[in-house]
Amino acid sequence: MYEFVLNGKKISFEENMNLLEYLREEANLTSVKNGCGEGACGACMVLINGVQGRACINTLEKINGKEVQTVEGLSEFEKQVFSWSFSKVGAVQCGFCIPGMVISAKGLFNRNLNPSKDEIKAAIKGNVCRCTGYVKIIEAIELSAQIFRQGKLNFDLERNGSIGKSLTRIDAMDKILGTAIYVDDMKIDGLAYGSALRTKYPRALVKKINIDKALNHPNVITILTAKDIPGNRYIGHISKDWPALIAVGEETRYVGDAIALVAAKSKKALKEILQLIEVEYEELVPLTKPEVAMRYDAPRIHPEGNIYRSERVRRGNIEDALKNSKYIVTNSYSTPFTEHAFLEPESALAMPDGDGVLVYTGSQGIYDEQREISELLGLPKKKIRCISKYVGGGFGGKEDMSVQHHAALLAYIIKMPVKITLSRKESIMIHPKRHAMEIKVTTACDEEGKLTAFIANIVADTGAYASLGGPVLQRACTHAAGPYRCNNVDITGTAVYTNNPPAGAFRGFGVTQSVFAGECNLNLLAEKVGISSWEIRYRNAVEPGDILTNGQIADSGTAIKETLLALKDKYYDNEIVGIACCMKNSGIGVGLPDIGRCNLVIKDGVINVRTSAACIGQGIGTIMTQIICEITGLSPNKVAIGFPDTFDSPNSGTTTASRQTLFTGEAVRIATMKFMEEVMKQYSEENLINHTKESCIERSIIRKWLLNNTDKVLNLLNDREFYGEYRGITDPINSPKENPVSHVAYGYATQLAILDKNGKLKEIVAAHDVGRAINPINVEGQIEGGVVMSLGYALTEDYPLNNCIPIAKFGTLGLFRAPAVPNILPIIIEKNTSDLAYGAKGIGEITSIPTAPAIQGAYYMLDHKFRTTLPLEDTFYKK
């Protein structure tokens, strides 16, 4: 018998079990999260006798006779303080890590109620946040300490929902207190547990699968193999090359390949059953690198060959340009695979729904899931309903199928609810990564430093399956030359299949890699010309009316020069400083369907927003709320954002390509204008005005009337729906037009990295052209989070493979933690006058792109060693 106190209540429990498992499964506490299972992420942080402890590496035996406290056990005043502070400063994004952060803050305050910033950083060293960059979390803890010292709280959270105001995130409170429900938090009666048996080898012929012993386990429900799939066995986000289950007689392509699916009555039984399945393999030599896979005699990973996709971007006369150039620089660069390391491992819960399936998920696009599940099950799409719960981070890593299709298949076959949640080890092994790339770049200029030619050859390791390797390669090529005037470019790209884990979407979408190479080359060119790295960028930066690398004409909202000017003084005032610029598209573009959609449904005195746009931490729900409030003048509490649901949420596309604020935001603006047109009719009828003749009634008059008659108007319009749709019209990548429109908008950025004489980062200055900041604190948080993610990419992160097998654990990925984060100064540049979504451009990806080359430039200035490989070697952070 084990006895302890949990949140002030005495507990007695006979079985010794993992503390995290007890808290989640027996005590039904949802604030403690299973982020890694190895004591490395801090999402399961609790207080044990008032001191921080990780629940995932403790047992009931270890805490016998002790007191355990979770967020649920805080006093009401403590909950108010933490909720207010974290909301106030914008410290919450995806929210998965936040309860653990709160507990670490509480543990710190138990011993020190007046901590320094360094002491706060040390206190949360064991907590990983992948979204915020820690900056605003540290501010929230500082503010909380101040309030606790004062002993009182003034409730003054921002409730003005207008554009340009830092409205408190609509979901912040639930995430802070741990009441926000992610998929793995869901409990359903009669739930079965599912998992896949994965191959032992990255490349092997599956000769036999024997499930007889496993079927004799008393707690087995079913075991499925490839022959049990009723529909199309091959799935894929774009290319259908990824088998949901590997069949007998088929080769495995990477260690994440699933051989069999098991449904069991308990998690414990699930592990036992998986071990009883016998698979006979013929191990084959894996193709470890693109250079190996591209050999003429290399075995084919897929029937079409090992070259998945090729791209070319060519303009001008590159040969003549090189002949006439004064200075030429050529270098080769290497960037690694990297892991998204979102804090919430993949999870899905599926159940029978009539003659179809209902799937609860936490991904970046419910309609993509619906389509792929319907193909797998051989059912019409209308038979598959997908509902998103809260999503604990994505960064591109939750665009592909991981567990959703397997959960749906099991639930459909056994007619029971089934949950599949990946362990962190499985997550690191299975989902697509950032592409490793080998990039050779030649950059040329005239005697004044004006760019004359840019040549690049990019080889991307797309791993075992296509995922989004094609579009990633395309974006790497179209953005490689940067936001500069250069009339002569020749960029080629090749995506190659290997037996490594698949590579796909990752924040920056290929641009992070190609810009690293291009920007580093530019510094050497400046050196040859005899001008500064800032000056060569300013001389070549595009202005409105200039032609971009892809032929598109830069629009009036182009503000790369403004970002350069914003940090010019910082650049010249510091001795050891690196600089880098970039551009990044908003929207999928290149002639593909790119649509934002929403329905505004008036119900019970509230405007309900229904859209499939996934919030993965970026705060799209808050943005939509502010757009509605801007137009109507209503309070944010009159707006409710629903969870994405294929049953009643219009398809607004995947949360990818930094598109949702612009595309879904514009759809919401259009729908809200339709709503206001109806309000105007109501006003006209009440005031005996002929609406058709008096269509120019001042908007301010209508807004004021609506505010004075809110409940009355909303009741009159009860059950009315107002649909909004925005279609981004663009040209295909191979358009014959001289100046095609590849994307509806581009954001621009310049970042500085400032080092001290020991090579330690002092500050990152990040100036970003965001068009219009709908919510400034939200924009700052995106900048800070993107910067810190790329601090790791530049300096410490890696995803090592041993013969195609991942060998990293969560704790060894090299993720940046709070104590290492330097000062980050976000500078918001607003120039865009476009009506689309009030001029907002996407900010989610571009924040992580220029950081690595800026840091490389700073180290080159420090020691004159020109580093061409990431993570950078021989630095303060990696010797």
Short names for language-model regions:
Residues 318-377, 474, 580-606, 611, ...:
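Conserved beta-alpha junction segments in alpha/beta enzyme cores
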Residues 90, 165, 171-177, 307-348, ...:
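Glycine-rich loop/linker segments at domain edges
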Residues 1-155, 590:
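Signature of N-terminal electron-transfer/Fe-S-associated modules in redox systems
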Residues 390, 394-415, 419-420, 620, ...:
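Thiamine diphosphate
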Residues 145-309, 328, 413:
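Flexible, low-hydrophobicity surface segments
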Residues 258, 264-266, 415-463, 665-688, ...:
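Phosphate/diphosphate-binding loops
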Residues 226-227, 378-383, 413-418, 472-582, ...:
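C-terminal catalytic domains of large/alpha subunits in multi-subunit enzymes
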Residues 46, 174, 180, 184, ...:
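Short beta-strand elements
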